Amino acid sequence: MSQPIMLPQGWEARWDPQANAYIYVDQSTGRSQWEVPLNPTFPTSPTPHAPPQRHGRRAYPSAMYAHAYDTPAPHVGPPQPVAGYAEQGTPQFITPGFEGQQPVQQPPYAAVDHVAGQFQQMNIAPGAAPVAGAAAGAYQGAGYAEKQLHSTKTKTVNLIGLQPDVAALDNPPPPALLPANASVTSSAHSQPDPSYQRCTLNAMPTTQSLLNKSKLPLALVMAPYRSIRETDNDPDVPVVEDGVIARCRRCRAYINPFVTFIEGGNRWKCCMCGLSNEVPQLFDWDQRAEKPADRWARKELNHAVVEFVAPTEYMVRPPQPPVYAFVIDVSSAAIQSGMVAVAARTILESLDSLPNADNRTKVAIIAVSTSLHFFSLPADATEAGMLVVPDLTDVFLPKPVDLLVNLTESRPAIESLLAKLSDMFQDSHTVGSALGSGLQAAHQLIGKIGGKIIALGASLPTIGEGVLKARDDPKLLGTSKESQLLNAGNNWYKTFAIECSKNQVSVDMFLFSGTYTDVATLGCLPRYTAGQTYLYPGFNASRSEDAIKFATEFGKVLAMPIGLEAVIRVRASRGIRMSAFHGNFFIRSTDLLALPVVPQDQNYVIELQIEDDIKGSFVVIQTAVLHTTCYGERRIRVITQAMPTTDSIAELYTSADQIALATYLANKAVERSMSHSLDDARNHVTNRLGEMLTVYKNQVTSAAGGASAQLAVPENLLLLPLLCCALTKHVGLREGASIPPDLRAYAQCLLTTLPCQTLIPYIHPRFYSLHNMPPEAGTIGGDDGAMILPPALNLTSEKLERHGLFLIEDGQNIFLWVGHDAVPRLIQDVFDLASYHELQGGKYTLPRLDNPFSERVCNVVDKTREMRRGVYRPQVYVVKSDAEPALRSWALSLLVEDRMDRMSSYAQYLTTVKSKVNGS
């Protein structure tokens, strides 16, 4: 039997059933903590062993080639410090306040090139076991609270000389260590899954001055309309269907797991403003069974994420039907690229997938070139009639009826039109596009109802409304004026977008041009109407890879169960207010976000401020999304998150979420690149990181006031510097005069809309070795029966081998890197070719061959394509190690730990940050 814990005088231990652990309370002050209040002992950290150093060029004995790719990699332990970063025997963990007792010798950082050279000579084996495919965001499933691990103290890590453990990017955020009995039930679902909502801090500072002093950002990161995936074992969102919605009379918060019942259960106390409210009469009544119900089983008291079916008082009009207006560019460029044919075929094949359960869905189709082509689709017709409007200055509808029609009633005419739409304009040699006028016509069609305009453009709008000019001046690229190309070139689009938002109209843009399209300007429409932008540069439907990618993504967009006519409002405990908003929406008032359509898996970031000092032991933040489902039901999705309060900077840093911080910094950097310059945006990321680590060094460790050879970070922020380094090298922000403005603008669209699960690999790609992956990789296994992926490698070219096959992916593209000494058997088994020289680089459709290795490689590629939420289907590019420079450079640019053009390596980036921390 274990010995009882002896506590110091004045302390007592209280059992916390939610945490399944004791919490220790100082009775004199009321202060509580998770660690045992004893005189601490500080065990010596184990001495890390540096890997054997290798000198000069690596030799590749030819005898090894024949079996290199099918020999499984040996089991390796956790990542070790890279030789050349720190001397062997350097302890990497620091106990705050005691690092003075742990002397560390560091290489002289004036010799940056020498350190970088040592880094490049290393070839460290991956330090992670094979992971199941669902592990990328594995914590994003049900019962997140059950998976939380309670940290008892801050661990400080010295980053200098430590190879980043990239597998830790999938770790859950630090837990919110709430006081005992903060929740009225013991449900494991009382806190939201991080894929719905997370905060940059999981402990709330009690004052704004403390927050300012910490230099930590305070922001919510949310994707409230997250998709439900069976492959991730996602549970459905619980729905309260009895019409009983308990709300606070003062702050209008919804009842949730963190309220308190008082006066014998007849009233409940709001956890945000403290007001006492009556419990609704039917709250404890089962209306279906007509008998008393168990209050503690109610969904809103057990689940942080819940939906209420809204009664009529939540409606200003009957729920709108789903409405889709397609505006299709039929100019010569669009026809010749094959875009029109693929788009029409995809719409035709998706008619059964469009949300139309109650047969209310409406559809309109408008073709645009130098004129507007409307199509009459009567309910009793089998053929469509075309009406041409050449007047583009004063757009009007040529017919009052049959242009916007019921999908079910006019199905024959719609199918007939889509089947021959491309052929109708096949002989057109029209150059120019009246896309702006087409958008205006679509708005006139659906503006009285609301809905979604889906615009497909293959050339720059050159006539009619919203004319744009080619402004991609190469002289501006790489200069401080490049930010001009990231802002709208014509205010008409923003004005039109705001008008659309007022009428509950959203716009999605699909852009295909092989030349400049001005994504920055056209992207204004989705940005202010809660839509999304999709770019297909150099699209050519004769390449099956292009056609399949567009058809797949377009089909998923059409089948998406969207929300309609929505508003989002975030409420928080007294003293906290929302100060800034980032994402695709229109800010209708100081705290109300208007979204004509709520697409799945779109991310939003909301900055918070502390107006008044916070007195309670914990705070609650609640997001409410009032929307109409595409099935005609008005609902409120409510997401409630609670976190403890603290007056300790050390606890703030221990609670910080590096994934949420990286997401916040990405949004702020994009905002700054548009308002200032790209250089300023990159500096902003690095400076914010430096400020945070400076405060951590000075306030949490004992190294305050002096220069240090170490770069101390809390263990939970171990990978934040790597993510910041990767962000500054991302195509949306990085330095260089060779990045087309459209690609940069599109990358910024993704940086501000992708949910965390997809954004992090977009910033920090995944890197796998396939030729020697463990035998279980590429097969079904694990407790959840998921596809097992190879161990993730660090993003450095030092991992590449001349005889190897590697996969690099960022969620948008997949690169298969083939070494020029790859053995013929590998080429034969994967590509069905006799030798490396027969292999062609570029976009590629990987064959599934009749051999085990091909099967496993294809499984890894397939799993990579579908492992994350969203509509995107990454294209596969084969990159030969001696390939054309542009493709090779593109793939290598994803290896963010390497030096890139004038941008520093990760080791050098840490040196820069350390200099900022030391004030030099």
UniProtKB/Swiss-Prot annotation:
Recorded GO MF terms: SNARE binding; zinc ion binding
All copies of domain WW, residue ranges: 5-39
Domain of life of the source: Eukaryota
Coarse class of the protein's main subcellular location: cytoplasm
CDD domains (alphabetical): Sec24-like, WW
Keywords: Cytoplasm, Cytoplasmic vesicle, Endoplasmic reticulum, ER-Golgi transport, Golgi apparatus, Membrane, Metal-binding, Protein transport, Transport, Zinc
Location of this chain's protein in the cell: Cytoplasm; Cytoplasmic vesicle, COPII-coated vesicle membrane; Endoplasmic reticulum membrane; Golgi apparatus membrane
InterPro entries to which the protein is assigned, alphabetical: ADF-H/Gelsolin-like_dom_sf (IPR029006), Gelsolin-like_dom (IPR007123), Gelsolin-like_dom_sf (IPR036180), Sec23/24_helical_dom (IPR006900), Sec23/24_helical_dom_sf (IPR036175), Sec23/24_trunk_dom (IPR006896), Sec23_24_beta_S (IPR012990), SEC23_SEC24_subfamily (IPR050550)
Zinc finger-like as annotated region, ranges: 248-273
Keyword hit for Ubl conjugation: no
Primary role: Component of the coat protein complex II (COPII) which promotes the formation of transport vesicles from the endoplasmic reticulum (ER). The coat has two main functions, the physical deformation of the endoplasmic reticulum membrane into vesicles and the selection of cargo molecules.
Subunit details: The COPII coat is composed of at least 5 proteins: the SEC23/24 complex, the SEC13/31 complex, and the protein SAR1. Golgi apparatus membrane; Peripheral membrane protein; Cytoplasmic side.
Family affiliation: Belongs to the SEC23/SEC24 family. SEC24 subfamily.
Protein name: Protein transport protein SEC24
